[in-house]
Curated annotation (Swiss-Prot):
<dbReference type="GO" id="GO:0000407">
    <property type="term" value="C:phagophore assembly site"/>
</dbReference>
<keyword id="KW-0333">Golgi apparatus</keyword>
<dbReference type="InterPro" id="IPR042236">
    <property type="entry name" value="PI3K_accessory_sf"/>
</dbReference>
<keyword id="KW-0418">Kinase</keyword>
<dbReference type="Pfam" id="PF00454">
    <property type="entry name" value="PI3_PI4_kinase"/>
</dbReference>
<dbReference type="GO" id="GO:0016303">
    <property type="term" value="F:1-phosphatidylinositol-3-kinase activity"/>
</dbReference>
<dbReference type="GO" id="GO:0000329">
    <property type="term" value="C:fungal-type vacuole membrane"/>
</dbReference>
<dbReference type="InterPro" id="IPR011009">
    <property type="entry name" value="Kinase-like_dom_sf"/>
</dbReference>
<dbReference type="InterPro" id="IPR008290">
    <property type="entry name" value="PI3K_Vps34"/>
</dbReference>
<dbReference type="InterPro" id="IPR035892">
    <property type="entry name" value="C2_domain_sf"/>
</dbReference>
<comment type="subunit">
    <text>Component of the autophagy-specific VPS34 PI3-kinase complex I composed of at least VPS15, VPS30, VPS34, and of the VPS34 PI3-kinase complex II composed of VPS15, VPS30, VPS34 and VPS38. Interacts with VMNA7.</text>
</comment>
<feature type="domain" description="PI3K/PI4K catalytic">
    <location>
        <begin position="666"/>
        <end position="1004"/>
    </location>
</feature>
<dbReference type="GO" id="GO:0006897">
    <property type="term" value="P:endocytosis"/>
</dbReference>
<dbReference type="Pfam" id="PF00792">
    <property type="entry name" value="PI3K_C2"/>
</dbReference>
<dbReference type="GO" id="GO:0000045">
    <property type="term" value="P:autophagosome assembly"/>
</dbReference>
<dbReference type="GO" id="GO:0000425">
    <property type="term" value="P:pexophagy"/>
</dbReference>
<dbReference type="InterPro" id="IPR036940">
    <property type="entry name" value="PI3/4_kinase_cat_sf"/>
</dbReference>
Amino acid sequence: MATLSQPQSALPKTKIATTFGLSKDLKSPISVKVCYLECTRNNVSLVPLSTKFEDPTVFKKLSQIYKNSDLFVEIRVYDGKNNNLISTPVRTSYKAFNNKGRTWNQQLKLNIDYNQISIDAYLKFSICEIIDTKPSVFGVSYLSLFSHDSSTLRSGSHKIPVFMEDDPQYSKNIQYGTLIGLTDLEKRLIDYENGKYPRLNWLDKMVLPKVDATFLKTNNKDHDYYLYIELPQFEFPIVYSDIIYQIPTIEPITETTSKIPPDDTLNSNIIINSIDIPMATSHDPSIMKVYDPDFHITANNHLNPNATTFDPVELKYRKLERNIDNNTILDKELKPTPQLRDELLRIMIKPSNAESTDNEKNLIWKFRYYFSKNNSGNDPSNKSVKSFLPKFLRSINWENDYELDHTFKEIIPFYWNVDKLQIGDALELLGDYFNPYTLGKPTYQDDSMTSKSSKMKSDEKRFIKIYNNVCFLRKLAVERLKLANSEELLLYLLQLVQALKYEALIYEKSPPFCERSDQIEDNASSTLKSPLADFLIERAVENEKLGNFFYWYVKVENEDQLNNPHIDGPIKIYMDILNRYIELLKAHCHENRLPYYKHLKHQIWFIKKLTSLVELLRASFKKNEATAKKVEYLREYLANSGNELLKFPEPFPLPLDPSVMICGCYPEESSVFKSSLAPLKITLKTIEKKKHGHATSQLFGKRSRYGKYPLMFKIGDDLRQDQLVIQIIDLMDQLLKNENLDLKLTPYKILATSPISGLIQFVPNETLDSILSKTYPTSVTYSGGGETSDGPPSVSNNGILNYLRLHSQEQQSEEPISKSILSTNTSQSNTEIPVLPRQPKPTITSDLGVSPILMDNYVKSCAGYCVITYILGVGDRHLDNLLLSPNGKFWHADFGYILGRDPKPFPPLMKLPIQVIDGMGGLHHENYNVFKSYCFITYTTLRKNSNLILNLFQLMLDANIPDIQFDPSRVIEKVQEKFCLQMTEEEAILHFQNLINDSVNAFLPVVIDRLHSLAQYWRA
């Protein structure tokens, strides 16, 4: 903020003080409120009725049919000088329009601050609609952020014209001065809305209707559409200002030394080229200079502004500290003291994206033999070597030939093989850090003080070494993945598909030299020949279940890259991989007479049929029409055998769950959800697998038994974030089962079939809101022995408790023991999964009138989801997305907000309503103590596997997932904070105990739940 004083006139000496702010000091993200879209034409030309019947394809573009069809606005910030995109786009959420017009009234915030933009920056508003499940531009608008007339930031309401074609030529007509097109009446109305005129209620009631009528008569019709937006208003006008950096000047090095006269009387030392040499007297003819090969590197860094500056003393210390010839023999026998061991353990638990200090790197280097000799990737109790290899590889200097040769010729070959590498470390080696173009980046700076030919030769030799070593590490990681069985590999497949982006950056990119070196293997020419791509395609072709999910994961990423060309990275990698997979799958199935390729074609046909069905429903019915009519239409459509959905031409595996074969659907059990997107609930007809030993099939021929599989198909939402959360929950469930801890979780299945559509498994459930509001018969209400008889009314009459009592008779037998699909020993990874010992009998008490089996399911699942949702930072928790199944299993749904994001103010760290505790008997019941014990065991178990979970999130940083892209730099940090890795196990348990107490006793979440229930009631 600045204050400028000016004389008002020449005669009087009074001054006017003007206060304003500077844009360089405004560290606030750019925000825009999208208000509404105005149509200046009275009669919008729509497609006539005859054309609708002649050409059904016109229904794809709803703006040709409905005057107020669905649209959304996408905002980008561009640099006006070069028209370069300088921010990631943000878009409005779905909004149901009425007959009055298209109104959003949504506030959008971009990921760029005001102090980061130039005076020529402008906003581009892309108004889009969905055509064939893909965004299509309806019109574009432009607005400059600064006015060049006054060099001030624009604020308040603005009316901007809409161009009906996305032509880059329109960006040349951006108005940087006073905006053209606003009438005097519109300017005054905007000034009135911005608060420049006082508001008088009695006068406004009389004048505003007449102003609106006059406004309609004098409406500007230069354009068919105008977009109204609002920019934030600040207390002071914001004047553009930029920071001017001074170019530092460095005096020649020789001048500083020549000014120091030699002292003949002192036997002193001087430093020549960073080496301490005894100084002889000036009369001594034996004076000599010693050449230091590192001196020209540090000196050239001062002359090259693009080079990274290093302290020459630190560089020399590092070289002497890691002199291979001097300390290799001593380092082999080094063992850390207890204090150093604790320090090293603290370094090991740091997340992979955390940069280690020089002292920490030197410690890792010093005790490299100690960790390498005692490594055992399959020993979970050996914490000291956990994640050592990636930490060690991050601590070496990749530009130092000695350290590289020592690492890849002695340490890794003799001490680290595939069996000793953990799966989490293998995933880390496939990340973006191990890239030769970034590890060797400082090497390729221009150096004017050395010979070009010698420098190119040295750089080429060094790059080839780095490149081959990185390729070796990635091959080592892939070899470790080959030891995993297909079920375990499926747990990491989503991240491995993302890792293909990093493979493409290495294998598709040409080296920084013109000619290809013979020392670089030929697999550098194509992503398809990368070890990871080759391995995934090979396993996907051989295993139908793995291939099913591999196809859909790659297909969605391919469509996302094609629809978002601004995303960095090679755009054809997923297209090439997809085509290669289909080609090899077709050949493999033809050679071995397998139905995998035919099943894949049927799955694609099935998804296209569902997509066309949703589009037909949306085109046939208005949004506000009764859901019953849509349901009736859906059932008639499904029952029509001509549509081929009642009975499929051939059975095929369900894309959502390939272990289920589907052959048709049940129309009467299908429905349409009451939602603006009109998602479908389809109950599919499944073919159940026959059990061995049935003689009837041999005597009377084949007789299939049929089952039911309800699912939801949704268009309009990106399900990849929910898909990621469910995958992490499924992984955590397997990690817990690997420790013989089955918490009865319900990781229902989700599969994104495109960036805006997908399938969701429909699990029978009821929301806690409906359970708590129901009235149960007196026969269910229990007041027998135990704590409930004389406990508080909130416990004895708890709706959850009554719900469990009501369903206690339905499940009297225990569920079979669920085994983990994770390999406890790599030698058994491709064989049968080891059988876990039988779990002990549940310690759940049955004095509440509930079956011990249901209460066991309820308490365990509550504990599991309590810990998991806390670690993942799941937000927007209310009683409508906390669910309970008839088998007593408690679970969460709708993961639209994760990593600490929440639309409500002051969200709790953990969602644990008191009603959930009352459902297990209350705070003073023994079941509550059992619940807390399960929470503590779950939390400590997942903390031990934090490295694997963090590495999975590390591979997802470049995925187009909303809550990850919101702040990708802090994703790993947010998850790591929840693990509290800096605490001991006892401290972590105490921390979680405090979290439970705070959540149970919290008052604000109870109020918000009541308000949410009230809002849902009035909305219904």
